[in-house]
Structure formats: structure tokens, C-alpha cells
């Protein structure tokens, strides 16, 4: 069951970007609004909402802000954020790398303009709907953080209906990612927690079916800068790209 390295390569390549920034309060609050709107406003009966709240609390968002976001999603508190749309944008980075972007916006024209500018400044271009979506498949991901015993992870993953997992053991990070079908994410998360594994968070993620290895340092820098720029936009919730950086370039790019 152990996963092919492609499952975690995107996570590793983004470590440098993610270390510099976390999700903003705006991004996390919007995730709560949409989750409450798409289901019931009770986190006990809405897994998407419960997950969004957990992430917000981990980021230090005050409870009153969380409650306000839930109310907006439920329709009992009205403002501009109450009319948020979920939109998936697609484009190409340097060298034709496919980029998938999930956004929550109250003004799709503003969001498209911001994304177009981000792509053009970093050697890419915003594409038409459907141009790269076929290159990705949505999966449920349970992220573990800490030292992982593989035999314990394997047993729990099989029991929880996981498709694959990847253990990440590096000097700066110890953990694992466990993938499953979207409909099975809540069950897998519960199983891993019940088996005592260190679950940090869960999420839905678009996983590339295949990846392109980047061996040119300038292209690698351009792509990482593009991801950084896209993820810094408040309207953007998640960004996925179908590339991995050649191992011999990782240190060089990270040091630049």
C-alpha cells in the first residue's frame, strides 16, 4: 500500500513556501462560511465544517470570529462574504506545468484579474476552464505529524479503507499523508485517530495523475514563486501543480 513518491512530492516541494506563510484569517473564515452553507451549521453533523473549524482554531482565530463565519454560512448574518462562490481556476506555469486553483470569492472578476497577474508575472498564464482539470483527481488526505511506525500505519490504513500512504522522514519534518476516496475521508480520519496515530489535519486535495520533473533551477524558482504568489491571495484556498523538483536541485533552490 505504501504510496509512490508522487503523492508527497508536491507537499515537499511546497515546504519552503508553506514555511513562510500560513492561511490567512480571511481564507480560513471563508472555508467555514462555505462549509456551513453547503451543509448544516452544526459541526457535529457536518464533517467539512468541523474540519474547517479545527484548522481555524489551530491558526488562532478567536471563537467569536468562528461563530460569526458559521452564522454567515447559515444565513443568519449578512454581509459581502455571505455571497461567496466556490470556483476552480486552471492555468499553466513555466514550462507548461499544470496548475489547479480552488478559490472562494465574492467578486469573480477581481479574482480572475489577480490570478491572471500572478501567472503573467511568473512565466505562466491563466487558462480556460477544463484546460488542465483532467490531469488531476480529487482525494481525501489525512495528514499526520510526528514519528510514525509503518506497521501501525499500514494496519490502520487498511482498516480505514485508505488507498495509499507516504511516510515523510526528513530532518525538518516527520510525518505521513494517507490518501483515500473523498467519500471515505471521515471514516479514515476517525480510524487513524482511534488507533492512536498523530492526526494533524484533514483536507480535500487535487492530486496530479502524473508529474513533471523539473531539472532547471530557474524554472524551479519561477514555479515556486508562482505558487507562493497564488497562495498569498485571500481569494485562493488551495493550489496544486503537477511538478516535482529534481532532488539534486532542492537544496540549491531552497538556499536561493
Question: Where is each model-derived feature located?
Answer:
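N-terminal cationic and glycine-rich segments that engage phosphates or anionic surfaces
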Residues: 1-127, 132-141, 185
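Positively charged, low-complexity, intrinsically disordered RNA-binding extensions
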Residues: 143-256
Amino acid at each position: 500500500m505504501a504510496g509512490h513518491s508522487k503523492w508527497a512530492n508536491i507537499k515537499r516541494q511546497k515546504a519552503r513556501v508553506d514555511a513562510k506563510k500560513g492561511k490567512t484569517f480571511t481564507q480560513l473564515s471563508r472555508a467555514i462560511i462555505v462549509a456551513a452553507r453547503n451543509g448544516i451549521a452544526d459541526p457535529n453533523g457536518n464533517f467539512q465544517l468541523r474540519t474547517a473549524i479545527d484548522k481555524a482554531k489551530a491558526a488562532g482565530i478567536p471563537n467569536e470570529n468562528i461563530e460569526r463565519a458559521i452564522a454567515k454560512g447559515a444565513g443568519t448574518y449578512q454581509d459581502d462574504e455571505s455571497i461567496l462562490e466556490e470556483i476552480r481556476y486552471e492555468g499553466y506555469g513555466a514550462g507548461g506545468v499544470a496548475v489547479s486553483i480552488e478559490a472562494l470569492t465574492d467578486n469573480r472578476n477581481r479574482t480572475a484579474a489577480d490570478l491572471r497577474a500572478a501567472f503573467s508575472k511568473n512565466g505562466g498564464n491563466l487558462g480556460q476552464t477544463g484546460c488542465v482539470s483532467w490531469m488531476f483527481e480529487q482525494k481525501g488526505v489525512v495528514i499526520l505529524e510526528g514519528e510514525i511506525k509503518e506497521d501501525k500505519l499500514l494496519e490502520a490504513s487498511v482498516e480505514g479503507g485508505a488507498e495509499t500512504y507516504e511516510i515523510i522522514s526528513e530532518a525538518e519534518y516527520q510525518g505521513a499523508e494517507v490518501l483515500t476516496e473523498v467519500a471515505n475521508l471521515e471514516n479514515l480520519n476517525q480510524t487513524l485517530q482511534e488507533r492512536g496515530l498523530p492526526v494533524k489535519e484533514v483536507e480535500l486535495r487535487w492530486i496530479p495523475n502524473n508529474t513533471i520533473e523539473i531539472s532547471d533551477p530557474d524554472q524551479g524558482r519561477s514555479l515556486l514563486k508562482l505558487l507562493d504568489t497564488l497562495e498569498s491571495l485571500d481569494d485562493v484556498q488551495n493550489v496544486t501543480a503537477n511538478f516535482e523538483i529534481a532532488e539534486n536541485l532542492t537544496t540549491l533552490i531552497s538556499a536561493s
